[in-house]
Amino acid sequence: MLWFDLDDTIWDMSGNSVICLRELYESQGLDRWFDSHVEWDEVYHRVNRELWAQYGRGDITREFLRSERFARPLRIGGVSEGDAEKMAVDFDTLYLDSLGRKTALIAGARETLDYLQSRGYRMGIVSNGFREVQYNKLRSSAIDGYFDPVVLSDDAGVNKPHRRFFDYAVERAGSQAMRNIIIGDNLSADIAGAVDAGWGAIWFNPGGDAPCDGLTGYECVVDLRELKRRF
């Protein structure tokens, strides 16, 4: 069975997020605190990466992540702490609602999914993303029909790379007797977690990043269409 991470593996989280953040910048008058939407985007993504790393380790809750990823950039921009906290609640709702309606996929994603489906491969999603937005992404971009099941950390009770997440995915799919293989862009959450769980793993590495020292037992592709030569 083939398991795909969703964000930045199949669904273009980076590109879609930039559009949503620009919409927030313009609709909420953020030029009062940031010189450009580029500055706002850079500050947000720096903070968001730090918080997602903490969330993946279980150091913070999803509720804290969702509020702090907007409150902290606003404070950095000069918004008072109280106002930043209030604005962050609204920003989170607006952002996730907009994000769930975006449709851009990673280059070659649909072509590759069509090919794998035509070859009879069963495919599922494994994601740390929030339930209320991940299903909207799948439906809006018309890729929900490729995947069964969709396994989210909200349902598993733990995040990738925890072993219990991967065991839960296998239980949901009933794929204990199958070879489970993950394709994902995150070396620690997707690849290291899968290898530890005894899965096969293919690192989607479009940027050509250097691998982590000491991590073995996985393959690498820089374009999703390479999967057509492997399956």
Regions found by a protein language model. Give the residues of each.
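N-terminal helical cap/lid subdomain that shapes the substrate entry/recognition surface
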Residues: 1-107
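Asp-based, Mg2+/Mn2+-dependent phosphohydrolase catalytic module
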Residues: 1-2, 15, 110, 114-117, ...
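Short alpha-helix boundary/capping motifs
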Residues: 38, 72, 98-102, 119, ...
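Residue-level marker of alpha-helix boundaries and capping positions
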Residues: 61, 103, 125, 181-182
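Short beta-strand/loop segments at the ligand-binding rim of alpha/beta enzyme cores
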Residues: 121-123
